[in-house]
Amino acid sequence: MTIWVDADACPNVIKEILYRAAERMQLPLILVANQALRVPPSRFIRTLRVAAGFDVADNEIVRQCETGDLVITADIPLAAEVLERGAAALNPRGERYSEATIRERLTMRDFMDTLRASGVQTGGPNSLSPRDRQHFAAELDKWWLEIQRKK
């Protein structure tokens, strides 16, 4: 089991939660990005730098993730792909993607893309709140407990 992070867009506060969790759970944490990242020294934490380009990091995560892994991403198409491979997907706000919710999320994403392409100002997501951080940490722990029960 490995925790993969779509690190280019992952908020630093979420990375900090993940660093602590990797140590506590003693699980590999791999941050995939197209730029150099600073991470704390740990035998569980490493970075994987990929070439710059559209979806390069996403494609690498999809290529390497396995059943039972967890992928941290706000990228809905990436979440859909890793779910198909048997991995779990969690966004930085603590929403766990599932087969039931991913289609709805993809449809909404496509709709918003269409609006933006037609010139409508849609705005971006709200800032990450303390409640979002707590929800993320709780969902991460929930995933870990589910994995432990399956052993």
Curated annotation (Swiss-Prot):
Domain of life (superkingdom): Bacteria
Coiled-coil ranges per UniProt: none
InterPro entries (UniProt xref): UPF0178
One Pfam family named in its UniProt record: DUF188
Entry similarity comment: Belongs to the UPF0178 family.
PANTHER family: UPF0178 PROTEIN YAII (PTHR35146:SF1)
Protein name (record): UPF0178 protein YaiI
Species for this entry: Salmonella arizonae (strain ATCC BAA-731 / CDC346-86 / RSK2980)
